[in-house]
Regions:
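Bacterial Sec-dependent N-terminal signal peptides
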Residues: 1-23
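Pepsin/retropepsin-fold aspartyl endopeptidases
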Residues: 18-388
Length: 388
C-alpha cells in the first residue's frame, strides 16, 4: 500500500512539474489580433503580431532601419514587396531569449498598418511554435511557454497536421442549402476572420451561391495586393467536439497564396480562436480548446455598409469601400470621404478597431460626420446586417 501511494505521489509530481511553464508573457488585443512584445539585439520592446499562419519572423523595414539592422535583398515566392534577410544576434519575446538559429526578415508593412489602423513592428509565429508548446489564455491575456510535449492537455483534444509551417485541423460545414461538406482548415491566429473558404474549395462546392444573402469587398494580406472577398453565412461549422451555428463566413477568390491552396479548404481565424483558451503543441501535433469567459457565439458583422482605413500618411480615417444597398450608401456616403466623428467622438479619441466595432452593432443608430468634397456631412446610420 505504501509503495502504491509513493507511485501515485511520484506520478502526480511529474504531472505537475511537466506543466510548469518556462515563462509567461502578457499580450494585448488590438481588434482581432494578439500583440506581444519582442526585442531584437536588446532593442526596446517592439509590437509584434502573434500569428500561427506566419512561417517567418518578419520585421517592418522602417523599424529595421531605426535599429540600424542591415540586410540582404532576397526573392520571396508570391511577394509583391521587397524582402530582406536581416543580420541580427538575438531575438527575445518579453525578455525570453529565443533560439539562435532564427532568421529574421524585413519588408514594408505600411499597407497592413493602413488597413488595421495600428503600427506593426513585426510578426512572429512558426519560429516560436517549432521550438515550444504554448497555452494562450484570453481571460488573463497571457501566453505560457513550455518545452515541446510539456504543455497542459486540457479541453477538447484535436489532432492537427502541418501544411508547410501552418497547423491544419479537420472540420465539417453545412451550407445554407443544407449540404454538408468535410474539409481541412488552417488554424491561424493572425487571420481576422471567423471562417474563410479557400477559392478552390469555394469554387468546387459553389459556396458563394449557397451562403444566403452576401456581399463582396476587398481584403489585404502580407502582400500589397487586394483580393475580392465575399461575406455570407452557413448553417453550422463543426471541428473537434465544437459546433458553431449560424456562422458568418468569408469566401476567397485568391489565385495566389494560402487561400488559393487546393489541399486545404480554408482558414479558421481569430474571431473563432479567441473564443477559446488553447494549447498548441507542434511536438505532439495536438490542439486543446477550452471555452474562455469571453466566449460568445453571437458574431458581429458589418452593419453599416462602409469599410474604413487610414490614409497613406496615417493621419486620416477614410471610407475605403461603400457597399450597395446598405445604410451608408442610402445615406449618401461616398468612397474616400474622410470620417471626422462617430457618435460625437473625433478620430483622435478612438482607434480604428473600435470604430469598426461600433459599425457592427446591429439595431443601433450611429451618427457619423464626414468630410465630402470639402464640406461636412452628417448622417445617421440605422445599422442592419448585410448578410441576414
Amino acid at each position: 500500500m505504501k509503495k502504491l501511494i509513493q507511485i501515485v505521489a511520484l506520478s502526480a509530481f511529474f504531472t505537475t512539474t511537466a506543466q510548469v511553464p518556462i515563462t509567461t508573457i502578457p499580450f494585448e488585443l488590438f481588434g482581432d489580433h494578439i500583440i506581444i512584445k519582442v526585442s531584437i539585439d536588446d532593442s526596446e520592446p517592439l509590437d509584434f503580431i502573434f500569428d500561427t499562419g506566419s512561417g517567418y519572423t518578419v520585421l517592418d523595414d522602417d523599424i529595421a532601419g531605426d535599429l540600424g539592422l542591415s540586410g540582404k535583398k532576397i526573392e520571396m515566392n508570391n511577394a509583391f514587396s521587397d524582402w530582406q534577410l536581416i543580420k541580427h544576434n538575438t531575438l527575445a519575446i518579453n525578455h525570453f531569449l529565443m533560439e539562435k538559429n532564427i532568421k529574421v526578415y524585413s519588408t514594408d508593412f505600411d499597407h497592413l498598418e493602413i488597413s488595421l489602423g495600428m503600427d506593426i513592428d513585426g510578426i512572429v509565429g512558426y519560429d516560436l511554435l517549432r521550438h515550444h508548446a504554448i497555452y494562450t489564455n484570453f481571460d488573463t491575456k497571457t501566453i505560457n511557454i513550455y518545452d515541446l510535449g510539456k504543455a497542459p492537455k486540457k479541453g477538447d483534444a484535436i489532432p492537427f497536421t502541418m501544411d508547410t509551417t501552418i497547423p491544419v485541423i479537420k472540420g465539417n460545414v453545412v451550407l445554407n442549402n443544407e449540404e454538408p461538406h468535410d474539409g481541412s482548415f488552417y488554424f491561424i491566429t493572425g487571420a481576422g476572420t471567423t471562417l474563410d473558404f479557400n477559392s478552390p474549395y469555394a469554387k468546387q462546392w459553389d459556396v458563394v451561391h449557397k451562403t444566403g444573402k452576401h456581399y463582396n469587398y476587398y481584403v489585404k494580406g502580407l502582400s500589397k495586393e487586394e483580393t475580392l472577398h465575399y461575406e455570407g453565412h452557413v448553417i453550422s461549422f463543426n471541428f473537434g467536439n465544437q459546433k458553431i451555428e449560424d456562422l458568418p463566413i468569408g469566401i476567397s477568390t485568391a489565385t495566389e497564396g494560402i487561400q488559393a491552396s487546393k489541399s486545404v479548404s480554408g482558414i479558421i481565424g481569430s474571431q473563432i480562436i479567441r473564443m477559446y483558451n488553447f494549447t498548441i503543441d507542434y511536438g505532439t501535433k495536438m490542439l486543446y480548446l477550452e471555452k474562455d469567459h469571453t466566449y460568445d457565439a453571437n458574431f458581429k458583422v458589418n452593419c453599416s455598409g462602409i469599410d474604413v482605413q487610414l490614409s497613406e500618411d496615417k493621419q486620416k480615417v477614410l471610407v475605403h469601400q461603400v457597399f450597395e444597398n446598405s445604410p451608408a450608401s442610402e445615406a449618401g456616403i461616398k468612397l474616400n470621404d474622410e470620417l471626422l466623428k462617430i457618435n460625437g467622438m473625433s478620430m483622435s479619441e478612438i482607434n480604428l478597431a473600435d470604430v469598426k466595432k461600433i459599425l457592427k452593432q446591429e439595431g443601433e443608430t450611429v451618427e457619423i460626420v464626414v468630410s465630402q468634397g470639402g464640406a461636412e456631412k452628417t448622417a445617421s446610420l440605422k445599422l442592419r446586417s448585410l448578410i441576414y
